[in-house]
């Protein structure tokens, strides 16, 4: 393999990552139903498709940073970013779309709502308080699961389509 072909392959890889970042940032900025975003789908896609471990974690986190710079940051962002990195890690381990989506969404639900319970004064710091927090978050979990499946299949089938046509190989 020549240097030129290796360089071009890396360029395609970077182009795919950049397009993914732009798409994610765009979808987080437009009005959408609560928790109906492509962030976990991007994380699952990056975990399965990007061979470089660090890159598969940096792509979804970078996209979040870009869109959060516009939307605004809050005190619990580090936990959300950690949950996103863990989603990519899960996808790398399972390497199947459906299992990765369900596992990532469940982990994201458990981590982020535990954070809500810990940081919020809305719930008593007791077993009943954490159960109430998780119970009230169930509708959001449904939207997270639905959007992650929806966007995951768009990403994976879009990638399969793009890599199957000759035009992609000339980019």
Features from the language model and the residues they span:
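Hydrophobic transmembrane alpha-helices
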Residues: 2-48, 55
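Interfacial aromatic-anchored transmembrane helix boundaries in multi-pass membrane proteins
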Residues: 26-37, 61-93
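Mature catalytic domains of secreted/periplasmic carbohydrate-active enzymes
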Residues: 3, 11, 49-54, 59-62, ...
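Alpha-helical transmembrane segments of multi-pass membrane proteins
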Residues: 20, 40-44, 80-88, 149-152
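Membrane-embedded alpha-helical hairpins and interfacial helices in multi-pass inner-membrane proteins
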Residues: 97-171
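Central hydrophobic cores of alpha-helical transmembrane segments
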Residues: 20-21, 56-67, 99-109, 171
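Hydrophobic alpha-helical transmembrane segments
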Residues: 14-19, 54-58, 78-82, 98-103, ...
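Structural signal for the C-terminal ends of transmembrane alpha-helices
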Residues: 26-27, 46-51, 89-95, 158-166
